[in-house]
Amino acid sequence: MEKSVAETENGDAFLELKKLPTSKSPHRYTKEELLDIKERPYSKQRPSCLSEKYDSDGVWDPEKWHASLYPASGRSSPVESLKKESESDRPSLVRRIADPRERVKEDDLDVVLSPQRRSFGGGCHVTAAVSSRRSGSPLEKDSDGLRLLGGRRIGSGRIISARAFEKDHRLSDKDLRDLRDRDRERDYKDKRFRREFGDSKRVFGERRRNDSYTEEEPEWFSAGPTSQSETIELTGFDDKILEEDHKGRKRTRRRTASVKEGIVECNGGVAEEDEVEVILAQEPSADQEVPRDVILPEQSPGEFDFNEFFNLDKVPCLASMIEDVLGEGSVSASRFSRWFSNPSRSGSRSSSLGSTPHEELERLAGLEQAVLSPGQNSGNYFAPIPSEDHAENKVDILEMLQKAKVDLKPLLSSLSANKEKLKESSHSGVVLSVEEVEAGLKGLKVDQQMKNSTPFMAEHLEETLSAASSNRQLKKDGDMTAFNKLVNTMKASGTLPTQPKVSRNVESHLLAPAEIPGQPVSKNILQELLGQPVQRPASSNLLSGLMGSLEATASLLSQRAPSPPMSQVFRTQAASADYLHPRIPSPIGFPSGPQQLLGDPFQGMRKPMSPVSAQMSQLELQQAALEGLALPHDLAVQTAPFYQPGFSKPQVDRTRDGLRNRQQRMSKSPAPMHGGNSSSPAPAASITSMLSPSFTPTSVIRKMYESREKTKEEMAPGMVVPGDGKEDTQKTSEENLLSSNPIPNTDQDSSTTNPKLSTLQRSSCSTPLSQTSRYTKEQDYRPKTAGRKTPTLASPVPGTPFLRPTHQVPLVPHVPIVRPAHQLHPGLVQRLIAQGVHPQHLPSLLQAGVLPPGIDMAPLQGLSGPLLGQPLYPLVSAASHPLLNPRPGTPLHLAVMQQQLQRSVLHPPGSSSQAAAISVQTPQNVPSRSGMPHMHSQLEHRTSQRSSSPVGLAKWFGSDVLQQPLPSMPTKVISVDELEYRQ
């Protein structure tokens, strides 16, 4: 009561407002005031002026009152409330059916319960009256007026004339029901009338259709527009049919279309399945099916249509196979066949394949329209599922390949030669098994000219065809087995070598052939075909870029290569090239000798990397990565940087986080760095960046500052000792590496958990900046597997390109990476010595992270990262010359260092050799696995202290990464603080 009275009061107040506008102070109420008024006793008294006829449930109902004032506004009878109307709906249905004027058969009862045209909106029992606001809905009256005018079916949705609209606005429920009955009756007569035109074949369909007409309003009326202006005029076909009367086939076809329209109008095609079947089965020339022969015109046996590869309907056994699988005869037409036309007229179920290769191609090509433009007759009906009639939109594969400048001559020319053989094999049932095909595909030669396009097709074929089965044979004489044809022609033309050839992409060097990921390749190829910027499949793109931007991975190769010459072949051009002995041990402390451990996983890596790949610019890489062409998992596998010792991290994390991080980083990374210049200072400079403080624990920051102070204090003039340390260092480092093998075992527990790493490692020997940065980020990013982290190499700060680390050592699951105590690249050592640092002092100085003040940093900075072998302590920023200030290292140095690490020899903690002495000492207790967290924290310090550096980490990493807490560390791992204290 209160509410309605309040409304009333408010209504009165507003009426007063209307009267008062002339007066200068009309009443204005705030919401609070009105609510307050509502609670007052006067508000609870019923004004005498309120007529009780507008009550609903004893409360005056303004809606009823309004309805009586503006009858057309929608309330059909002011006396009945909405609730009463809706309650009366169901009984009204039943009564209507019993109406003597109802000519429809008794099973209308079923119809009432069956889905109706408006089933989307209102369930089975909805009647027009339910939309109470529109119970005077245009449609019902329209049905009368317009029917009289043109005898048009209700579904045609003509715009209603105002006369019809206003007419009978006060109809009672019974009147409305009668109206509906009349409409239905008229519909029924209409249908009978049409049925008399000799359309005997549609009798069954008419019955169904008639049932579906219980509700005259098409669903889009009841669920859709509420005003005339919103009504869309959909012209009907019945008028035309009546006019054309006895025009035979033409009329029949149009009516078929109109029936379909009616079906869709009424029912969304739910109740009409049988009718559709009947129509489609009995009307072979129905325009709805545009045979796909339009797309793939048959050609004389001498010609070969490239698109035939993708037409599954030409594969003879396919239809029968599918029928066997589905257990259906070839006659049964799908009830949805009008939307999914089957180019092979056989009516076989092969059209029920989820999607044809053409469709797949279009989807990949992005050519698929959201709603495909309808074909010839599809304009006749509104279908939720786009019709198949869009022949013109099909992708012409041949055209695509031509656009991509793919040379098809060898393919096509070899076809005629193979034709007979293929025919025989297809008749005899000899078909490549999926495994064979896959094997063939894996070995595809990725030719720069051919650009994988042909392989892509093979791959695509394999995917689509193998879904059905390994039997792939073409039906027509002129068309050979799609698969055999493709594969054989490829083999014949040399596109598909029997033995996988070493592809020019680094991919094949890095990945064993079996690992070449199929998915990314196919996607990328498509991209290439479509003229996208990607120049190689993303996977190989990334890889080749990652590896390629490092001019030669001499370190990796030299470390692993069975023979020294190889490393020599790939000697880097970096300033430090002279330091590369053919067998320089890898920085990570894996001796070249005990390589057996590494051997298997890295076989892929042993393949020489072609310099060509080195040309890949990082931008391209970034593009590829950003475009997400390769699946994250594949990318991660392929691009995991192996020189990253910290990388014993489970692949899962890397794939999850790495891809995202890498992409962010890539998108932000500065112009591509030139990987070749490992010694150029510029890249180093570009690396300068700092970790945001939020990223670094306060204790670490404090330590950083303390150590910085300490460095400054300790800087003392150094003695110049021209050192011939280079060779000694190298030898010793090699020895150390050999001896360091045992150490790795400490890490084995963690690494064994990572069997997947081997693939990762295998996949990339080195990665350019994008990777690097990704790792720096990932290091932070990977808190979950703290145990797995290896302190050794903090990847250089994101900005730096990896200047071809000469010695990256991929992690191997079972060979933990050890970070030997002293690790300074011999070249660096030599320079330091040349600058007057006595070799004896190096270990202690380095351990403390301090170099004597006399040392000139410039040359050191110029050193490529590979030379600065200090893993833990980055070089201090150029401004503060101390050489290896542990925390304050500039990212630049970080990067440099990193590279150096990669190249440099890591000496096992215990080694007493001079190299050990010379190289920076990492506290020996840092277990190899402490890696990431530690590294990472280091990285943070280094970078974070580098707050002076212009480039902030934020530039490279998303805030999510920067704000993550440091990874938790297993007990074996030394925290940075401990590390510093021990020093």
UniProtKB/Swiss-Prot annotation:
Q: In which tissues is it expressed?
A: Highly expressed in developing oocytes.
For the region Interaction with CSDE1, give the residue spans: 130-160
Say if the entry is tagged with keyword Nucleus: yes
Sites where N6-acetyllysine occurs are at 485
> Where does this protein have compositionally biased stretches of type Low complexity?
344-355
Keywords carried by this UniProt record: Acetylation, Cytoplasm, Isopeptide bond, Nucleus, Phosphoprotein, Protein transport, RNA-mediated gene silencing, Translation regulation, Transport, Ubl conjugation
Q: Where is this region: Interaction with LSM14A?
A: 447-489, 938-983
Q: Where is the composition biased (Basic and acidic residues)?
A: 52-66, 81-99, 651-660, 724-734
Q: Which residue ranges are recorded for the region named Disordered?
A: 1-22, 40-99, 206-229, 341-360, 585-616, 642-693, 708-800, 906-951
Query: What family does the entry list?
Result: Belongs to the 4E-T/EIF4E-T family.
Give the transmembrane region(s). Answer: none
Covalent cross-link Glycyl lysine isopeptide (Lys-Gly) (interchain with G-Cter in SUMO2) as placed by the record, residue numbers: 409
Name it.
Eukaryotic translation initiation factor 4E transporter
What's the name of its gene? Eif4enif1
Q: Where is the composition biased (Polar residues)?
A: 735-774, 910-928
Origin species, per record, is Mus musculus
A biological process term (GO) from this entry? mRNA stabilization
Motif residue range(s): Nuclear export signal: 437-446, 612-637
Q: How does it assemble?
A: Interacts (via YXXXXLphi motif) with EIF4E. Interacts (via YXXXXLphi motif) with EIF4E2. Interacts with DDX6. Interacts with CSDE1/UNR. Interacts with CNOT1; promoting association with the CCR4-NOT complex. Interacts with LSM14A; promoting EIF4ENIF1 localization to P-bodies. Interacts with PATL1. Interacts with importin beta only in the presence of importin alpha, suggesting a direct interaction with importin alpha. Interacts with APOBEC3G in an RNA-dependent manner.
Free-text note on domains in this protein's UniProt record: Intrinsically disordered protein with multiple low-complexity regions that confer binding to multiple RNA translation, deadenylation and decapping factors. The YXXXXLphi motif mediates interaction with eIF4E (EIF4E and EIF4E2).
